[in-house]
Amino acid sequence: MSYTIAAQVRTEIGKGSSRRLRHAKKVPAVIYGPGKEAISIVFDHKDIINIQENQDFYTSELTIALEGKDVKVRVQDMQRHAFKPMIEHVDFKFA
């Protein structure tokens, strides 16, 4: 199954800006990989909360629509809140 997530590039980086994003129902994330520069991104929490319940979300390639470009990635790591059904941060790896 193919999943697509619409995202924007993040300009503010750090703990304070990440907390502000989470309060606004956004998820900070990063895309990295060998030989490529890391890209900090942000997307809506509602875009990922339902699709992450499917098992193939973690093993298949995802498409991130990033400023008019489609970037193929795989989920490397996902950090969740301790007791709330919230995703706090996602690490993606270039596919």
UniProtKB/Swiss-Prot annotation:
Gene3D superfamilies in the record: Ribosomal Protein L25, Chain P
Family: Belongs to the bacterial ribosomal protein bL25 family.
Function, in words: This is one of the proteins that binds to the 5S RNA in the ribosome where it forms part of the central protuberance.
Subunit annotation: Part of the 50S ribosomal subunit; part of the 5S rRNA/L5/L18/L25 subcomplex. Contacts the 5S rRNA. Binds to the 5S rRNA independently of L5 and L18.
Pfam family, one: Ribosomal_L25p
Domain of life assignment: Bacteria
Keywords, comma-separated and alphabetical: Ribonucleoprotein, Ribosomal protein, RNA-binding, rRNA-binding
Keyword Membrane: no
Cellular component annotations (GO), alphabetically ordered: cytosolic large ribosomal subunit
InterPro entries, alphabetized: Rbsml_bL25/Gln-tRNA_synth_N (IPR020056), Ribosomal_bL25/Gln-tRNA_synth (IPR011035), Ribosomal_bL25_short (IPR020055), Ribosomal_L25_dom (IPR029751), Ribosomal_uL5_bac-type (IPR020930)
GO biological process, one term: translation
Protein name per Swiss-Prot or TrEMBL: Large ribosomal subunit protein bL25
PANTHER family given in the database record: RIBOSOMAL PROTEIN L25/GLN-TRNA SYNTHETASE, ANTI-CODON-BINDING DOMAIN-CONTAINING PROTEIN, RIBOSOMAL PROTEIN L25_GLN-TRNA SYNTHETASE, ANTI-CODON-BINDING DOMAIN-CONTAINING PROTEIN
GO MF term list: 5S rRNA binding; structural constituent of ribosome
Keyword Ribonucleoprotein recorded: yes
